[in-house]
Amino acid sequence: MASPKVLLLLLALLVGQAPQHPPPYPRPGTTQVFENDVIAVWDVAWLKQKYPLHTHRYDLIGVSYVEGDRIITQGDAPGRLSSTKPWVFQSNVAGNTHVEEGASDPPMRAILMEVKAATPRTDVAEATDGLRQVVGAPSWENRRTFAWAIPPGTAAPTHRHARDAVELVFTGATPATTPTVTFVPAGTAHAGPVPEAGGRVFIFELK
């Protein structure tokens, strides 16, 4: 009979050889619009097809910009139909494994950002001229971001980013199209951005 140590070693080898699910992106309907060592930004459309089972490697944040439907299947549970309006903040967590399927035509579209740091920073001091101070409380937040939806027709006054940030600037096109994406390093002080008439701005400060 094999010793407990041998059994543990065999188990570790089996676990190490277990097939790994692919990451969610790239896949049909997605385009990477920006990447650095902090974040990867994807323009995602849920086409009318069933995507492979995948595991999210990173925490995910973002915002939808075209209304649409998805079917999300988690484990052995039946698929769940999810309908999403435009301009709704999105999130997911690292380690989540599921199947997605587009269920509408035209497809739902969103800008989704993979936050590469495994855990939020806890050593950030708020700037006295930060967005919270000059614009107000975030429109949305979770454990990985503070996010502001700047009202259409307005622009953020001069402010300083205490954290790395991503700005999404949408034109006034209907339906909405892929935004301009700008990475703003921590410590940057600036005004804006200023959208065109009918456009929208979303600012995500990364935790």
Question: Could you describe each region identified by the protein language model?
Answer:
Residues A18-F34, V124-R132:
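N-terminal low-complexity, Pro/Thr/Ser-rich intrinsically disordered segments
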Residues K5-G16:
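Bacterial N-terminal signal peptides
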Residues V93-A118, R163, P185-K207:
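Ligand-binding loop in jelly-roll beta-barrel domains
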Residues H56-I71, R160-P175:
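Short, conserved beta-strand element in jelly-roll/cupin
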Residues V99-P151:
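Surface-exposed beta-loop interaction hotspot
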Residues F34-V38, L47, Q74-G95, T174-H190:
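Short acidic-glycine-tyrosine-enriched beta hairpin
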Residues P28-H54:
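Mature N-terminal segment immediately following signal peptide/propeptide cleavage
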Residues A110-M113, F146-I150, A156, L168-V169, ...:
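Fold-core signature of tandem repeat domains
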